[in-house]
């Protein structure tokens, strides 16, 4: 982890409601890492667990506005920084989590572990796009933790996820359109890096080409 990344990590960790729970790197490993999550709003009752699209986009920093609006409406919210992403990307040494640690089953079990750490028996689960895959997985592996569930733009299997990724790449990079040409131009000029395409796809999904 670089100096700048470490400094940003410490800043986010100091935000109200941010906590870390120790999780195994792999089921058979004795090594553990800090999985971060944030809980905001009223503490009583069943919170809303929001699982946004992705994968690869952090939750703690990017969705502060949504959590503030939810808190203003009297809703408690939990969002997990999933393993391999953002504040939950590294093992204690600062190295990235190994590929074998990044499985759907592990991510789903992480969500249940967060509910344990937060003292929550059941929660209302909201998943969007890729987040619906994780939400459904939680319902399968830990059905007793789910009070209600909303699946927004659901992915039903891994093939659906590949279709979405392929369409996003075509739309934002490969197509002969003004939007794709701008994305290629900004990347070539060093304004964007390839990883920014993940964020661009999320922005496009929310507000279309005008917002992007």
Language model feature labels by segment:
Residues 186-212:
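Alpha/beta-hydrolase fold active-site neighborhood
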Residues 16, 33, 131, 138, ...:
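A structural signal for the main folded, soluble domain(s) of proteins
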Residues 4-35:
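N-terminal cap/lid segment of alpha/beta-hydrolase-fold proteins
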Residues 92-106, 163, 167-168:
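Catalytic nucleophile-loop/oxyanion-hole region of alpha/beta-hydrolase
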Residues 121-160:
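Conserved hydrolase catalytic core segment
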Residues 105-123:
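Conserved acidic catalytic loop of the alpha/beta-hydrolase fold
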Residues 144-188:
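A catalytic-pocket lid/entrance helix-loop region that shapes and gates access to the active site
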């Amino acid at each position: 982890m670089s100096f700048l990344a470490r400094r940003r990590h410490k800043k986010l960790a100091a935000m109200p409601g941010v906590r870390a729970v120790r999780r195994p790197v792999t089921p058979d490993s004795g090594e553990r890492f800090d999985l971060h999550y944030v809980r905001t709003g009223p503490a009583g009752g069943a919170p809303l667990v929001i699982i946004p699209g992705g994968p690869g986009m952090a939750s703690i920093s990017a969705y502060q506005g949504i959590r503030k609006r939810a808190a203003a409406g009297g809703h408690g919210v939990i969002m997990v920084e999933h393993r391999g992403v953002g504040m939950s990307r590294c093992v204690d040494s600062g190295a990235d989590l190994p590929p074998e640690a990044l499985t759907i089953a592990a991510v789903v079990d992480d969500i249940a572990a967060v509910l344990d750490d937060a003292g929550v028996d059941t929660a209302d689960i909201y998943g969007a796009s890729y987040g619906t895959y994780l939400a459904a997985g939680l319902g399968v592996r830990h059905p007793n933790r789910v009070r209600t569930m909303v699946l927004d733009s659901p992915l039903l299997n891994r093939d659906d996820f590949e279709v979405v990724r392929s369409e996003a790449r075509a739309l934002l990079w490969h197509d002969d359109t003004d939007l794709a040409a701008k994305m290629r131009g900004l990347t070539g000029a060093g304004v964007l890096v390839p990883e920014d395409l993940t964020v661009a796809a999320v922005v496009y999904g929310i507000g279309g080409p005008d917002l992007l």
